[in-house]
């Protein structure tokens, strides 16, 4: 429709802005591992159940697109994959907890029927879904992984564990957390240091990293403003 047509180019092309959103030393650290003017191959894992991102994805297409002039070192962008990790509204959306320990009752947590109803991984096994496996493959295959629009909550611990696995693969793998609070946190160096440290700690703790690992892995986690990427030209129209 008109909204998708008007926004697909700006939304997807804006993913190239992650590089210009970094601080100079952070950018230097990442670009030092890769040649500049590189082609950005993008795979998207979304926890959203709606059709919005898939429609934007398909409207943009999978051919090479030129990037905006100020996208810093990225010459072109191409979409590769999009996976709705927890299903979609039209096909068995997966809602629930990460594991049975998060069910607030010992009796209920040991009940197989309850587990197959409320534990995300068990629900996906029951329905024979491969969405979560495809999503994990994308995460573990990334060079630069951007976390956008997520609270790093306990019900998605298995995904944060995958993020930590990615960081452990080597020094050429990086994670960017796109935060809506990044701009306000930068009002002073001290406030941004505290904010950044807390966010990294939350991700690494949820991902199962030990203290020694946290010190090393946190050096390859950077915080960028959420407004840097996924830029819409217009608002989603209200339903009639």
Cite the ranges covered by each PLM segment:
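Extended, H/D-rich, highly charged conserved domains that either
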Residues: 1-130
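SIR2/sirtuin-family catalytic core signature
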Residues: 42, 73, 131-240
């Amino acid at each position: 429709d008109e909204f998708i047509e008007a926004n697909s180019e700006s939304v997807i092309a804006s993913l190239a802005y992650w590089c210009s959103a970094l601080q100079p030393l952070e950018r230097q650290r990442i670009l030092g591992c890769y040649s500049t003017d590189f082609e950005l191959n993008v795979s998207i894992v979304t926890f959203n159940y709606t059709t919005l991102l898939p429609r934007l994805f398909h409207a943009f297409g999978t051919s090479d697109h030129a990037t905006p002039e100020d996208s810093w070192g990225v010459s072109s962008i191409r979409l590769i994959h999009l996976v709705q990790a927890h299903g979609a509204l039209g096909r068995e959306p997966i809602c629930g907890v990460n594991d049975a320990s998060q069910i607030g009752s010992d009796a209920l947590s040991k009940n197989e029927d309850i587990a197959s109803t409320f534990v995300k991984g068990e629900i996906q096994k029951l329905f024979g879904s491969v969405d979560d496996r495809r999503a994990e493959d994308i995460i573990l295959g990334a060079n630069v992984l951007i976390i956008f629009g997520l609270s790093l909550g306990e019900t998605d611990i298995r995904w944060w564990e995958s993020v930590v696995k990615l960081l452990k693969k080597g020094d050429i793998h990086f994670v960017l957390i796109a935060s809506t609070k990044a701009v306000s946190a930068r009002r002073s160096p001290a406030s941004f240091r505290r904010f950044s440290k807390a966010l990294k700690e939350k991700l690494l703790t949820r991902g199962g990293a030990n203290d020694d690992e946290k010190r090393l892995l946190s050096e390859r986690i950077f915080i960028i403003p959420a407004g840097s990427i996924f830029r819409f030209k217009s608002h989603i129209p209200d339903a009639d």
